Amino acid sequence: MHPSQAVAAPLGNATHHQEMTDHGKKQLTPHNQHRISGGFGIEETVPNQRNGRLTRQQNPRLLRTLLNAASRPAECEANAVRKIVRLVARTGCRTHILHVSSGLSVDVLRQAKAEGLPVSAETCPHYLTLDCDHIPDNATEFKCCPPIRDLREQDALWAGLADGTLDGVVTDHSPASADMKAGTLATAWGGVSSLQVGFRAVLTGAMRRGLSLADVVRWMSCNTARLVGLDDRGDITPVLRADLAIIRPYERFVVDATALESRNPICACDGMTLNGVVTRTFVAGRDALSGVREGNLIVRP
């Protein structure tokens, strides 16, 4: 998070978060009031009616049952967002909601923004491009929290991006070794490795819905840079830092997890056909690939 008094925490005791947001409100200044003062990951669980806890033995191979219906249904996520929005309304604290995965949460955020509350929110590539009904049993590479939900929820997330309710898309890149992903969905490490393919996965989904490359760049670069105060980058504009990728948006490729740069060849997009072949990458104006001859400046911008 940006150093302008940003905090991050899971949803827990409401009194604790009231104290946190009060603290953040006190530290706002004219310089940083448009940036994040509080950041919250949204997560609540449903207790098992029999013993007050969700048992690990309850359908440990089915992602839909174990992570969606049994422990983290969309209603719980939306309830968590409602609690945060109420605190924002009471304190005026600039707040960012992480990892939105459900349409119910989008509805809450849409209303909050309509009321002028200082709240922003993001979702992730896996919530936009994968759905729980097409995930094989015990495929632990898809395990994450909040969980990957169904197509109805996915459509609602895209609608939230299109109308500006959701401000951006972030990778939430969380790689893991084969040992960490071993076992069942109940025991395996939760996290999706998406850094190298996340942008292309979102681009593919956007193009299928009639959205553009410019939309994806706005969600995954421009808006995110502004959100955390990286004012010197994030857009293609004179005087900004030249962090650029040269991409062929209509050229397609098949994801091969073993060919990715990650140390661990585990990827939820393995085998998917995606749009967007990257041909060159520049970091601060320099070609990121070693041994590539640099060009000369011909015309001053």
Regions found by a protein language model. Give the residues of each.
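Histidine/acidic residue-rich metal-binding segments in metalloenzymes
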Residues: 1, 35, 39-41, 47-169
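Short, strongly patterned local motifs
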Residues: 1-24, 28-31, 36-54
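Detector for intrinsically disordered, low-structure N-terminal pre-sequences
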Residues: 6, 45, 215, 297-298
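His/Asp/Glu-enriched, well-ordered alpha-helical/loop segment
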Residues: 64-83, 87-94, 141, 160-169, ...
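Short, glycine-/Ser/Thr-/acidic-enriched flexible segments
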Residues: 102, 126, 174-176, 251-252, ...
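Glycine/Thr-rich phosphate-binding loops of Rossmann-like dinucleotide-binding domains
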Residues: 106, 129, 177-179, 254-255, ...
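Ser/Thr-centric signal marking residues that sit
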Residues: 123, 171, 221, 279-281
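C-terminal cap of metal-dependent C-N hydrolases
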Residues: 184-187, 238-299
